[in-house]
Amino acid sequence: MATEYTLSDLCAAFEVSRSGYYAWASRPPGPRAQANARLAKQIQEVYDEHHQNYGSPRVTNQLRQQGHRCTRKRVERLMRQQGLRGRQQKRFKVITTDSQHDQPIAPNRLKDIRITAPSQVWVADITYVPTAEGWLYVAGVMDLFSRKLIGWAMEGHLESRLTLNALQMAIQQRRPGAGLIHHSDRGVQYASADFRQRLQDHGLEASMSRKACCYDNATMESFWSSLKNELVHRCAYETRAQARQSIFEWIEAYYNRVRLHSSLDYKSPVDFENQLN
């Protein structure tokens, strides 16, 4: 049976007076405690601003960019005390593309390539998003230098114009020079005559992953994983139009302009490209 002690009993046991205890209990927090309280509030603001997705590394770097002096260890401790945890990225599922078609397959041109500027290599892929109306298929084109998504299209089908529209958006945004490498999987949408002709018309070189090896396009797979973990899995879309609007806003207003990337020295894709100017 647990024994209950009065305050007088505890004060006597520790040889302190009741008045001394009350003086200690009522004194204001010290400078360190006050600083931690301020930082904890700022951590909460960053955490909420980024939809409770950021863990301590991104929160720390976001705070530093805002002018706050803090270490990752301190931020991690305060986040733990507040019960704040970043959303864990699930490993992407290995879903290989059906390459059973009679279209030409381009070689993998990414081996040993060194990327030093925008519009050297673009990577492209397709994913799908569930809605109450059925699947919404999303095609994306990313600049491998900055991880910026520069082209996308969303349709309720997997016809070739899905990938063509995403490619055309990227071309209009970037106006690339001849020789740029466009890398994708071996799917028929990327191997089709229309797609190959569009690449040729703009002087772009096709590159494709090895057979049944989605890891050759891991950067795009990682992007889809972020999109689904940070947005799609939190939503229940009634219509494809609702999903389109939500995904558009996440890409254009958040992912490209705000979201920090560890591979970009904790900068957003737009900020990473702007530092070149």
Question: Model segments located where?
Answer:
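Charged DNA-binding/catalytic regions of mobile-element recombinases
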Residues: M1-N277
